Design a protein with these regions (language model features):
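N-terminal Rossmann-like NAD(P)+-binding subdomain of aldehyde/semialdehyde dehydrogenases
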Residues: 1-113
Length: 113
């Protein structure tokens, strides 16, 4: 079982303001495969403020810096491709072949286009 209870906000993993969780259920077999934090308005506000602050500097980044960032994202995505396939298969209940051949490829495809 995988529990993901923290949020990635402002460059770090932080705990939610709430201890409430939501079950993640595999729709193919109805097994509970993990829990995620339910989050709060305060968690959302922290994330929105962090994103707004980041935009204030990111908007001035160069084209080359942005290309490098996207290339790094693609590289890490490719390194963890099987993790994406496994997670999509569990969370959506889709067959592994479909997760691998189509669904997990969408992320890289969107960046490369």
């Amino acid at each position: 079982m995988k529990d993901k209870l923290d949020f990635y906000i402002n460059g770090q993993w932080v705990q939610s303001e709430s201890s409430e969780t939501i079950e993640v259920i595999n729709p193919a077999n109805e097994n509970i495969i993990g829990h995620v934090s339910a989050g709060t308005k305060e968690d959302i506000n922290k994330a929105v403020i962090a994103a707004s602050d980041a935009f204030q500097t990111f908007q001035y980044s160069s084209k080359d810096d942005r290309i490098e960032l996207l290339n790094n994202i693609v590289s890490e995505y490719e390194n963890r491709y099987q993790d994406f396939v496994d997670t999509i298969t569990e969370e959506m209940g889709s067959p592994i072949w479909l997760s691998s051949a189509a669904q997990a490829k969408t992320g890289i495809k969107n960046i490369n286009e």
